[in-house]
Amino acid sequence: MATSNHITWHESAVTKVERQQRNQHRSVVIWFTGLSGSGKSTISVALEKALYQQQVHTYRLDGDNVRHGLNNNLGFSPEDRKENIRRIGEVSKLMVDAGLITITAFISPYQADRDEVRNLLDDKEFIEIYTSCSIETCESRDPKGLYQKARNGEIKGFTGINAPYEEPNNPEIIIDTEQDSIETAVNQIIDYLKVHDYLDVKPV
């Protein structure tokens, strides 16, 4: 891919801090990671709704949705998976700069790729949430029928079946989606945001 050296970064007249003060909350990336069927999308949708009801400015990026547009030229090879997460990381960084709480739901199977996104952001701007769930339970849910297709050889490189998933080394939050309800999971995340002062920024 060709790149250009003749580009300049243009600073905005409105800073990230000013946007956070206007919104009265800090901006951050809430990054859900876990196997297909572990509950990432379900919990992220419920979290977005709960935060919206509290007048929090959010946007949710979903793994399937971005492949309809931004990443529709990517497949599921290790190289394409890496590029998929790199692009989402850059988009998430822009949204954090815009003052939003950005909720992402991606399998994001590789620790190194998740760490690269974390390193794009400032300190405390990345909250990794691991939706912990056994492969057996994920496969029994199989909301899209993908596990069965992978078992039948119709899908190659499917995470958990014939491609690896690396559990997070030290996530900020672990949700046991085999035990915890959606409501419990959402409350756990919101409690974390409150305790760590993400939801209380006073306007100047």
Swiss-Prot record:
EC number(s) reported in the record: 2.7.1.25
Binding site for ATP: G34, L35, S36, G37, S38, G39, K40, S41
GO biological process, one term: sulfate assimilation
Catalytic activity: adenosine 5'-phosphosulfate + ATP = 3'-phosphoadenylyl sulfate + ADP + H(+)
Domain of life: Bacteria
Keyword Transferase: yes
Pathway: Sulfur metabolism; hydrogen sulfide biosynthesis; sulfite from sulfate: step 2/3
Keyword Cell cycle found: no
GO molecular function: adenylylsulfate kinase activity; ATP binding
Signal peptide: none
Disulfide bonds, paired cysteine numbers: none
Record-linked InterPro entries: APS_kinase (IPR002891), P-loop_NTPase (IPR027417)
Keyword annotations: ATP-binding, Kinase, Nucleotide-binding, Phosphoprotein, Transferase
Active site location: S108 (phosphoserine intermediate)
HAMAP family: Adenylyl_sulf_kinase (MF_00065)
Protein family (similarity comment): Belongs to the APS kinase family.
Biological function: Catalyzes the synthesis of activated sulfate.
Name recorded for this polypeptide: Adenylyl-sulfate kinase
Species for this entry: Staphylococcus saprophyticus subsp. saprophyticus (strain ATCC 15305 / DSM 20229 / NCIMB 8711 / NCTC 7292 / S-41)
Lineage of producing organism: Bacteria, Bacillati, Bacillota, Bacilli, Bacillales
Gene label: cysC
